């Protein structure tokens, strides 16, 4: 029984710390004290037995054990396995180029089974999982890669992509910032960080529209209303609209003149856009930013 006393002492220490927290009611604290007394009685341990104390608190030992649970010791990998694993990684990379993402996942998984301490394999599998929209699995693989190599910037970058796809923009920003800390000159991380930051601002805004371009502000803008009214009073626009209505109810077709009418509408629309640009340029800039943000890329980086 003496061999387990350090463990029991650590448990008692943990329970005593918990009993002193305000998070518990008086009855719950009393129950913790009873548990402590029972353990001390059964294992014949007292608070004075400080020689039984270990260097790490019980919670820290538990956390470290959980983090390392999925990673087998490096000694399990032999040179032959490492070489075969690298070949499987290359096969997986080829499948990625061919957009055969399921096959790529299979190759990377086999590589991990042979060499479970290679961060690159987890990170590459994360990229394939993201392509399959398996974002939760992609994040888990990135976390495993980071657990092996905490300075692996690509793992943080790919985690940011998966988090962004899941609309977890705040976490994505953190991942991209960490990636940039490790690789400050990476343009892909810079670009994706800006996109994630923009998305975060959108979902945090009072309107909650999720759009960079505020259509409500445009419609309610007095300058826009005035310009829209001016456009509708344009004789060319009125003539074209009249012709369209006539055709819609079965009137004579516009014939060759339809091209001229369409050209007139385009010209009137261009004039309208120029007026908005001159009188309210910030709305045009919002629209441009919205269009740019829609072109969010899932990264074009090469695989390791």
Swiss-Prot record:
One Gene Ontology biological process: protein homooligomerization
GO cellular component, one term: membrane
Residues with PTM N6-acetyllysine: 131
TPR repeats: 15-49, 85-118, 120-152, 153-186
SUPFAM superfamilies per UniProt: TPR-like
Tissues expressing this chain: Expressed specifically in brain.
InterPro entries found in the cross-reference section: SGT, SGTA_dimer, TPR-like_helical_dom_sf, TPR_rpt
Phosphoserine: residues bearing it: 293, 295, 297
Entry GO MF terms: Hsp70 protein binding; identical protein binding; molecular adaptor activity; protein-folding chaperone binding
Alphabetized PANTHER family for the sequence: LD24721P, SMALL GLUTAMINE-RICH TETRATRICOPEPTIDE REPEAT-CONTAINING PROTEIN BETA
Protein name: Small glutamine-rich tetratricopeptide repeat-containing protein beta
Gene this protein is translated from: Sgtb
């Amino acid at each position: 029984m003496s061999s387990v006393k350090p463990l029991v002492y650590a448990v008692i220490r943990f329970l005593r710390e918990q009993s002193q927290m305000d998070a518990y009611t008086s009855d719950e604290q009393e129950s913790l004290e009873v548990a402590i007394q029972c353990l001390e009685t059964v294992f014949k341990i007292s608070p004075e037995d400080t020689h039984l104390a270990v260097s790490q608190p019980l919670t820290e030992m538990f956390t470290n054990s959980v983090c390392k649970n999925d990673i087998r010791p490096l000694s399990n990998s032999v040179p032959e396995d490492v070489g075969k694993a690298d070949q499987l990684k290359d096969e997986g990379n080829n499948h990625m180029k061919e957009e055969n993402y399921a096959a790529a996942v299979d190759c990377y998984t086999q590589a991990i089974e042979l060499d479970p301490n290679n961060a690159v394999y987890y990170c590459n599998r994360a990229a394939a999982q993201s392509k399959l929209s398996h974002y939760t699995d992609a994040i888990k693989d990135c976390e495993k890669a980071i657990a092996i190599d905490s300075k692996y910037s690509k793992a943080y970058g790919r985690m940011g992509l998966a988090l962004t796809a899941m609309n977890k923009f705040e976490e994505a920003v953190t991942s991209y910032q960490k990636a940039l800390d490790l690789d400050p000159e990476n343009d892909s991380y810079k670009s994706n960080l800006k996109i994630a930051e923009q998305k975060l601002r959108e979902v945090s805004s009072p309107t909650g529209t999720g759009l960079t371009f505020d259509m409500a502000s445009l419609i309610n803008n007095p300058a826009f209303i005035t310009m829209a009214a001016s456009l509708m009073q344009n004789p060319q626009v009125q003539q074209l609209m009249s012709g369209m209505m006539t055709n819609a109810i079965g009137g004579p077709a516009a014939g060759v003149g339809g091209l001229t009418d369409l050209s007139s509408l385009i010209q009137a629309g261009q004039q309208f856009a120029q007026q908005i640009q001159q009188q309210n340029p910030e709305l045009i800039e919002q629209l441009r930013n919205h269009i740019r943000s829609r072109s969010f890329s899932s990264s074009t980086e090469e695989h390791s």
